[in-house]
């Protein structure tokens, strides 16, 4: 086997090399590949492994991360060369996943210790730390809203890849938001994280239901990523909500909701995303299932319900170049009161708008009192979108034309026959179709659609004509 293997990062602006240098590099790479292939099953041991450049990381934390390579439960030289290289690569990937290192290079030499075997290795992982303090200001586009924000992030706070962040933002719907978030890996595993979050948010709901909603709360959560690209999130939430700043036109139903409410809940969310592109996928699936149980615990509060919501999307390419794709989406939710009281306006589902049911005004589908939307406890929504390139525009550009059809509805669950609620939604759905232009960026997706409501109920507000949408979670 060779004396040394080394992985090195190079600057992107190096000058072009001549043909002789190219041939030399190709021959070296070919020779190295042949040596690795010939010795892939050779039993090797790791004499020493060390991480350099981690100046602000605790040695005890580094030792836990390196346990993948230094597994003392296995006998010496029980791994082949290929298995050892894969383990080293996996360990380096784990280091990078903590989001505290900028680069990591691997250097492998023959063991220099006099007590080491001929096929033992010395491994050095050279890392470069990211700045410990990061400050950012800018603008964001969320689901049908925009904001300006300032973020502060402190990395490696206690030397164990902890992250402490603070955020302040002001926007069109979320008038003011402040949050503090602390997260730390559990047992030096980047796939399992413990998070603590404290936040305050003032949301403007006047255009929908004649009030503002002030929310303050804390959340403790445990997040784990499994081997099948699934993400599990278990959270304990304690929230104080206030329906406030009612307008003079607020309906009696909204006025009855005015004031304070306290919610303690336990929630579980499973997410699996295999799409090749977040904004304009051409293949893959997206699944999100959320369960929330409110009203139990040391401080039960006045909210008591069981809430379930499912989101799913399937994308398939319709041609070999993947420039034409079909996307099918479905969402369904149910909310059941556990104390025989009406579920608070703060917790009900809302439906309608460019990111859910195109062709209808934002959150204006379902039960109402006068001009105020009251939300509901049961909903279904379906969407089919055909995306294809613009004429004379390169298919690699993030522009697409879109043909779509949406259907769905929002209502309230009836206790004697909850299934009948969904049958009623399916029998009289809100339906729209249309054509539009899609522009995708890494941060958000923008749509400009001409929409045509085909079917609507008496109270639901359809929008014929141009409708603009900006956000992340589109159907």
Swiss-Prot record:
Its main location: mitochondrion. It comes from the Eukaryota. Keywords: Membrane, Mitochondrion, Mitochondrion outer membrane, Transmembrane, Transmembrane beta strand. The lineage of its organism: Eukaryota, Fungi, Dikarya, Ascomycota, Taphrinomycotina. It is a multi-pass membrane protein. This is SAM50-like protein SPAC17C9.06. It is found in: Mitochondrion outer membrane. PROSITE patterns: POTRA. Associates with the mitochondrial contact site and cristae organizing system (MICOS) complex (also known as MINOS or MitOS complex). May be required for the assembly pathway of mitochondrial outer membrane proteins. One of its GO terms (cellular component) is SAM complex. InterPro entries: Bac_surfAg_D15, D15-like, POTRA. It comes from Schizosaccharomyces pombe (strain 972 / ATCC 24843). Residues 44-130 form the POTRA domain. Belongs to the SAM50/omp85 family. One of its GO terms (biological process) is protein insertion into mitochondrial outer membrane. Its C-terminal part seems to contain many membrane-spanning sided beta-sheets, that have the potential to adopt a transmembrane beta-barrel type structure.
